[in-house]
Amino acid sequence: MDMELSGRLKKLPPYLFADLRRVEAEARARGVKVIRIAIGDPDNPTPDPVVEELCRAVRDPADANRHRYGCDVPVEQFPQAVRNFCKRRYGVTLREDQVVTTSGSKDAIAQFALAVLNPGDLAIAPSPGYPTYNIGHVFAGAVTYQVPLLRSNGFLVDFDAIPLEVRRLAKVLWLNYPNNPTTAVADLDFFRRAVEFGRRNNILICHDNAYGENTYDGYQAPSILQVEGADEVAVEFFSLSKAFNMTGWRVGFLAGNASAVRGLRAVKDNSDNGTLRAIQFAAAKALDSYERIVPPINAVYQKRRDLVIDALNASGWNLEKPKATIYVWAPVPGKYRGSSAAFAADLLERTGVIVTPGLGYGQWGEGFFRISLTYPDDVLTEAMNRIVKTKG
């Protein structure tokens, strides 16, 4: 039987990264020697202290619950480590009811829409932006208003440019700084304006802080929760994936507004069974060891960032070095007339290099492409050698 899928799935565009994997498979089948530098999935292993804690916890004979549902017997050490981390890193004090453990950011973002949005509600998401914001809205039956992130404004949301009718109707506004895909960063004054915007318009500010710890040249990214009163109108999504090389582990947390946190916890109670206890113990170890673990990881990305930026600039791109994230965001060469899809397709056919076309992040991502730094130096070097040949 050919089952007809739900209408909500039919409303979704092809998922960007699934589409990239399909394109790669098709190219390899044609005999193309592919170099993929498109997806942000760390190539280096999870740090030893975290792995060792996982192994200890999963084998611990004293823990009779170690293989049981993570939701029924949660690890108290992880939310405590979260609160300690937020206090040490940001100076933010969180109550127990302001934190919930998640299976990474992606799951949490999609589930969160079910917690706070009703069919027909309006939600604001950035363009370009992480596709899962809009995907969550579709699952909840909500409608997305895309607010443009413009190069002329440093890829920051312009709150004043959001129409009054949108402000009146919207229930949530998504922010993401350091930003994927643009690599833009925001200062604490920007977050103060965001909190005031949320308070004035009765809009929940949802800040995706997935890249807040991937920073370079001494830069430290702020948290929206550092703003006085932010926990009244904002939540912040954290992930251990990129900061600790733990993408496959699927663990993170949501912090902030207690009622919104309670809403996500209710969705999770009814849709999943939590995170394996051993992973929670290991995640607590990661957060407790943040100061020792994260700097060496960032040093690798900073070196790769310099490698990529220097190579592109030597061939005429004129890019600034991003202060954060694990990406490089660049305009497509002029001969492609602003078409990121045309550039990405031609690059693959001519050189075998796969980058992410900016259009995949929304209409305002058009004209740009994204490179991920989660590939070995020699792979990035070879990819740059191939890319610069297309510049003319």
Region roles according to the model:
Residues A284, A299-I309, L319-V332, G365:
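Conserved glycine-rich beta-strand-loop-beta hairpin in the small C-terminal domain of fold type I
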Residues E96-D97, L114-L175, L188:
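PLP-dependent aminotransferase-like
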Residues D2-G104, Q111, L287-S289, G392:
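N-terminal small-domain helix-loop-helix segment of the aminotransferase-like
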Residues L150-Q220:
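Active-site phosphate-binding strand-loop segment of PLP-dependent enzymes
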Residues D121, A142, R200-I203, D231-E232:
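A short helix->loop->beta-strand "cap" motif at the edges of active sites that frequently abuts
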Residues N84, R88, R337, D346-T356, ...:
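PLP-dependent enzyme catalytic core of the Aspartate aminotransferase-like
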Residues V227-Q302, D306-S315, T390-K391:
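Conserved core segment of the aminotransferase class I/II
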Residues A27-R30, A140, R200-N201, S315, ...:
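Helix C-cap/helix->beta junction micro-motif
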